[in-house]
Amino acid sequence: MPELPEVETSRRGIEPYLVGQTILYAVVRNARLRWPVSDEILTLSDQPVLSVQRRAKYLLLELPKGWIIIHLGMSGSLRVLSEETAAEKHDHVDLVVSNGKILRYTDPRRFGAWLWAKDLETSNVLAHLGPEPLSDEFTAQYLFDKSRNKRTLIKPWLMDNKVVVGVGNIYASESLFAAGILPDRAAGSLTDAESVLLVATIKAVLLHSIEQGGTTLRDFLQSDGKPGYFAQELQVYGRAGEPCRQCGHPIEIAKHGQRSTFFCRHCQFRPIWPIMLW
């Protein structure tokens, strides 16, 4: 599933082609996504795009009448194409804008969403979200206080959007590895010092992934059709049985909250970051 770096990469990729342009029309080839494509998407002709923002894993297109809210789901991606590009099987939604470009949404598994909101404050999908991990609001003190008395395992706890947004399976595993914290510890066991280190590693891992265009494991593509290159630098995620890049011991895999967790039991008792290959 695209996580914060992939969504932010998409935002940065599409923003120059949309902001200041006017929507000519939309094409919905298949409205049956995770939630049905909002009817309003087809009524936005002559609406200028004022901004392209991101909240958590949602892309937000600001128009005078309201907001288009896009979620990439498990396998979605957005590309900016020229007008003559023919649609393929999994190309479900197009926005055609006044510079002749098409914002095309492709989603083989159809688990994403195209929703409409008159204002973000009343949007159910954006309610109750935690802080952005790259914001000043996400601090070591916040994480330490939030973790007190929590018996939940730390890895699924970090993936809870009420705690912090956008840190999914890939980046939770990678950040815990960089911080030298085993994923099967209770969240409440975090110390002050570990909270400082974990916040720093989460920010560093996310920022570096954004610089690399995110992680492509299967379906995700950047807006220009290129894959994300952070997959080549993953330290533990998806590497079960392979030698750890730091110590040579095999990477282990476990199930935490129905999700696969990757870690190095030999390394994750001491900080690895900033002594990372990248």
UniProtKB/Swiss-Prot annotation:
Recorded GO molecular functions are: 8-oxo-7,8-dihydroguanine DNA N-glycosylase activity; class I DNA-(apurinic or apyrimidinic site) endonuclease activity; damaged DNA binding; zinc ion binding
Q: Which residues form the active site?
A: P2 (schiff-base intermediate with dna), E3 (proton donor), K57 (proton donor), R259 (proton donor)
Any note on cofactor binding?
Binds 1 zinc ion per subunit.
What domain of life? Bacteria
* Enzyme Commission code(s) on record: 3.2.2.23, 4.2.99.18
What reaction does this catalyse? Hydrolysis of DNA containing ring-opened 7-methylguanine residues, releasing 2,6-diamino-4-hydroxy-5-(N-methyl)formamidopyrimidine; 2'-deoxyribonucleotide-(2'-deoxyribose 5'-phosphate)-2'-deoxyribonucleotide-DNA = a 3'-end 2'-deoxyribonucleotide-(2,3-dehydro-2,3-deoxyribose 5'-phosphate)-DNA + a 5'-end 5'-phospho-2'-deoxyribonucleoside-DNA + H(+)
Instruction: Indicate yes or no for the key word Zinc-finger.
Output: yes
Stretches assigned to coiled coil: none
How does this polypeptide assemble, per the annotation? Answer: Monomer.
Q: Which PANTHER family match?
A: FORMAMIDOPYRIMIDINE-DNA GLYCOSYLASE
| Name this polypeptide is given | Formamidopyrimidine-DNA glycosylase
- Supply the source organism for this entry: Yersinia pestis (strain Pestoides F)
Q: What is the lineage of its organism?
A: Bacteria, Pseudomonadati, Pseudomonadota, Gammaproteobacteria, Enterobacterales
Quote the gene name from the UniProt entry: mutM
